[in-house]
C-alpha cells in the first residue's frame, strides 16, 4: 500500500479553512489527484457533514474527528486520532495521493506536528485585522504556506491590504503567501500549484487564472 501525502489546513475560527477545501479539492481532482479529507471539530462533525453535503468528494472519503480537547492538541501534541483516521482512509482507498487534515479553529499559535503531516497551510482572513502579520504567531511564521483569505472584505472592515502584503512579506521572508477570495477564485491557482509542486512533487497547473 502506498502512503498518501498528508497536508494540514489550520487557522483561526472563521478564517475560511472549510471554504478553501470546498474550492481547491475540485481543482485537484480535475487534475487526476485522488483526495480524501479528515476534519477536526471539538464536539461535532459539523465541517465533515458540510463537505459531504457539498459533494466535492464521495462521502466515504471524508472523516470527521471529534477531538474533545484544545484543537492544537489533536494536530500537534497528541495527533493519534488523526493518524488513525488517515490510516483508515489509506486502507479503504489504497490509491489515494493526498489526505488533507483540517484542524479545528484555533489561534495564531496553532502548528501541525510533522509526525502527522508532510506540510501545512495556515489560513487567516483580513477580517481579523491588518496587524496579524506583525503579531508573528507561530502558525503564521512557520507554516509551509500562508493563505490570507477574504481579501475582498478589506475595505469593509477597514483593513489595509497593502500593509498586510508588505508586513506579511517581511515576516514570512522567503516563505510563500497566497492572497485569496474563494468566491471569485482569486489566488486559488497559487494554493493548488503549491500543493502540486511542494507536496505532491508534480507539475504546476498550466492554467494560471482560476478566477470566476
From Swiss-Prot:
SUPFAM superfamilies (UniProt xref): P-loop containing nucleoside triphosphate hydrolases
Cell compartments where the protein resides: Cytoplasm
The UniProt record lists the keyword Chloroplast: no
GO-annotated biological processes: urea catabolic process
Gene Ontology cellular component terms for the protein in this record: cytoplasm
Main location (coarse class): cytoplasm
Keyword entries, A-Z: Chaperone, Cytoplasm, GTP-binding, Nickel insertion, Nucleotide-binding
Single annotated GO MF: GTP binding
Family annotation (Pfam families): cobW
Binding site for GTP: 11-18
UniProt record similarity statement: Belongs to the SIMIBI class G3E GTPase family. UreG subfamily.
Quaternary structure and partners: Homodimer. UreD, UreF and UreG form a complex that acts as a GTP-hydrolysis-dependent molecular chaperone, activating the urease apoprotein by helping to assemble the nickel containing metallocenter of UreC. The UreE protein probably delivers the nickel.
Cross-referenced HAMAP family: UreG
Function: Facilitates the functional incorporation of the urease nickel metallocenter. This process requires GTP hydrolysis, probably effectuated by UreG.
Name by which UniProt lists this protein: Urease accessory protein UreG
Organism the protein comes from: Trichodesmium erythraeum (strain IMS101)
